[in-house]
Structure formats: C-alpha cells, structure tokens
Amino acid sequence: MRHLLSVTDLDRTAATELLDEAERFEQALLGREVHKLPTLRGRTVMTVFYENSTRTRVSFEVAGKWMSADVINVSASSSSVSKGESLRDTALTLHAAGADALIVRHPASGAAHQIARWMDGWARESGRSHGPAIVNAGDGMHEHPTQALLDALTLRQRLGDIEGKRVVIVGDILHSRVARSNVFLLHTLGAEVVLVAPRTLLPVGVQSWPARVSHHLDAELPGADAVLMLRVQAERMNGGFFPSAREYSVNYGLSERRLALLAEHAVVMHPGPMLRGMEIASAVADSPQAAVLQQVTNGVHLRMAVLFRLLVGAQEAIA
C-alpha cells in the first residue's frame, strides 16, 4: 500500500488487516507508562490542513509521535499558501524538505489523489522507487477514509462483527465525505447500510450507492445495530436545504425518545464535531450506548496502523 486515498482502494482483506493492526497497536501500548514505540523513528510525517480540524489532525499527530516519528504540522493560514502558493508547489516543497508521509485535508474533492499523482510522477522521473506516502484526511465532500476505518473498528469492538449488521446513517448525506466513505467501506465489510435524510440533503446519484435510502428515521431505528449521526454542514450551504434548525431536529435529530426505539445493544456514533440539541440530544451523546469518545481513541490506533502500513509495511513486527 503506497497511499490511502479512498476506501474503494481497500478490499475486505486489506481493510480487515488495518483494523487488526490497529488493535495490535492498542495492545502494544497497554501497560506502558510512556506511550512510545520506536516503530517510525527517523521518519518524518507532515500534516497539511487547508480546512480546520481537531480530531483528525490531533490524532494523526499523536499517532506519529507515539511511534517516534518526527511530526510537523503545516497550517495553510500561516504558510506560503496564504501568499498564493499552489497546491503542487506546496506539496513538492514539503517533499523536498524531507517528508516521508503527507497527511492532507483540502476543500477540493480529489486533492489528495492529485498530490499522489504528482509525487508518483516525481519518483518516476527521478528514478526512485517511490515518493512520500499520501493520506487523504478529507477532500471536500468526497471521502474521509481513515474516519470510515475508525468507525468500522468501533463497530467491530461494540458489536463483535460487522458482517450482516444494519448501520443507519442519518443527516447531511449531501455534504458528508464521512457518509460516502462509510457507505462503501461498510458494504465491503458486509454490513447493510441505510441512509436517512431529507430529499434536499441527498446527493445526485445516491441510488447507485450500495445503500437503501429512507426519509423516516423512526421507522429505521428499531432494526438498527448502529446509528451514525452526521453534523449539518452549514458552512457548505447557502440556505434553503430545510425550513429551520428546529424542524430538522424534530424530523432527523436523535432525541431521548428515539434512543428508546433502538435495541439495547445498538451503538450511537458521531464523527464530530457534534451540534448538541440539533442532530443529537446531549443525553443521547452522553449515554452508555454512545461510542463517540471510543471513536476518538480508536482514531489514534487506526491512524498508527495506517502510517505503519504505509511507511514500514505489513511484514515488520510492531516494536
């Protein structure tokens, strides 16, 4: 695996191996007073975020540091990007500065794929076996593969297996890269996926996705093994998608009443940040069925696994 750009690059075996690797890292860190492994000593990981992030950026940073990598955070607002530098020049500059891996978040769909093409082209032209590994940390409304992987890891830990489970994804499907990645990864892992949203928040072509579409949340909750709530991405909207926040919450928010419709074993998830009181009630977000903080913890271990596979390979042992 040279890059991680899309969940569609992973078959069931590859995805399962990453989940297994993440759990091995979790076990390797248990009982250690200092969370530090020498696995990536001497490697340089750079995070390049053109959009704001807390969970993804921090967890990649922690993942790299726990494996002894040198981690450098590049903020678009404080770099030469703010002076008009192109994405290509920024990527090549960071590579020339010694990056072994670039973790990229960008508002344009396909940005990480383009950087990977530039890096692979540079490697061919220079006669090298490869350039830096590229990880897609979110590209516009397209994909967020590591989020889908950590969600799958959380589901596996809570439910025992993903095969045959029903996962209901609720909310702003239209603008959600998390929804897209989850739909395709969960399908690969054998889950049944149901999308619940108002018609205005469904993308064109959603009928071709491996998921069933519904507009009635109450009808879908009793048979769900897991519910993944999505934030309404107001920053990507210009109005007119639904009448009001209150009406949206009434129709598509996960309230205490709706929580009671779920089976006792069902898991409630959210990729964050949560809009408490809109798509999810505080009492639900803080309930025993909620796995929101477990998702964050799993994000570190999963991203350790991704960096390990990209920079070391599957045959090496975890130190």
Curated annotation (Swiss-Prot):
Positions bound to L-aspartate: K83, R177, R231
PROSITE patterns: CARBAMOYLTRANSFERASE
A Pfam short name: OTCace_N
Coiled coil: none
Keywords: Pyrimidine biosynthesis, Transferase
GO molecular function, one term: amino acid binding
Record pathway: Pyrimidine metabolism; UMP biosynthesis via de novo pathway; (S)-dihydroorotate from bicarbonate: step 2/3
Signal peptide: none
Catalytic activity of the protein: carbamoyl phosphate + L-aspartate = N-carbamoyl-L-aspartate + phosphate + H(+)
Gene Ontology BP, a term: 'de novo' UMP biosynthetic process
Record-linked InterPro entries: Asp/Orn_carbamoyltranf_P-bd, Asp/Orn_carbamoylTrfase, Asp/Orn_carbamoylTrfase_sf, Asp_carbamoyltransf, Asp_carbamoyltransf_Asp/Orn-bd
Record's GO cellular component terms: cytosol
Top-level taxon: Bacteria
Function: Catalyzes the condensation of carbamoyl phosphate and aspartate to form carbamoyl aspartate and inorganic phosphate, the committed step in the de novo pyrimidine nucleotide biosynthesis pathway.
Oligomeric and partner information: Heterododecamer (2C3:3R2) of six catalytic PyrB chains organized as two trimers (C3), and six regulatory PyrI chains organized as three dimers (R2).
Protein's name according to its UniProt entry: Aspartate carbamoyltransferase catalytic subunit
Source organism per UniProt: Nocardia farcinica (strain IFM 10152)
GN (gene name): pyrB
